[in-house]
């Protein structure tokens, strides 16, 4: 998923969601990386992906009762991904699906502390602490090799 505003069109907004070991909250990974950065061009499973570009079979969506309207603004996408995983399915990021997204374009750019606290509290109360994505921590201090010097296979 690429940023939709002019000047940002060649930078990644989202290539999966991780649970950061520092605050136990979901975060986009690889934000602001270059479009063809090798680490953003690997299909892989995650705990969650963004709702800004999410595909799910209708039958599964209905079976897990879709998005939860108890969330005010944030984390509905993470919640639905957790429900998908709890139902025994994988949550997969693929670099082969490309979209441009103007984050906050309809709801506004900022989220109040009250909204964030409500939605984060709901997510944590409902799902508890999720396992860290062991190889995908935001500070990159663990696991993933630095692949920036590796050329992508663009056949």
Give the predicted meaning of each segment.
Residues 96, 109-134:
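Catalytic core of nucleotide-sugar-dependent glycosyltransferases
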Residues 1-64, 78, 87, 98-117, ...:
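Acidic/His-rich active-site region of diverse nucleotide-sugar glycosyltransferases
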Residues 90:
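Residue-level detector of anion-binding/catalytic polar loops
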Residues 120, 127-154:
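C-terminal accessory regions of radical SAM enzymes
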Residues 73-74:
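A short, glycine-/small-residue-rich helix N-cap motif at loop->alpha-helix starts
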């Amino acid at each position: 998923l690429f940023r939709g505003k002019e000047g940002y069109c060649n930078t990644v907004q989202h290539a999966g969601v991780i649970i950061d070991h520092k605050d136990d909250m979901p975060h986009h990974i690889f934000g602001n990386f270059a479009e063809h950065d090798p680490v953003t061009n690997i299909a892989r499973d995650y705990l969650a992906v963004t709702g800004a570009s999410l595909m799910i079979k209708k039958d599964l969506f209905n079976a897990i009762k879709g998005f939860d309207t108890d969330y005010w603004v944030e984390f509905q996408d993470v919640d639905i991904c957790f429900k998908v995983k709890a139902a025994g399915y994988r949550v997969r990021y693929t670099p082969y699906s490309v979209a441009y997204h103007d984050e906050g374009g309809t709801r506004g750019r900022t989220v109040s502390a009250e909204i964030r606290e409500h939605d984060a509290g709901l997510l944590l109360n409902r799902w508890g602490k999720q396992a860290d994505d062991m190889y995908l921590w935001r500070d990159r201090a663990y696991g993933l090799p630095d692949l920036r010097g590796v050329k992508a296979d663009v056949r």
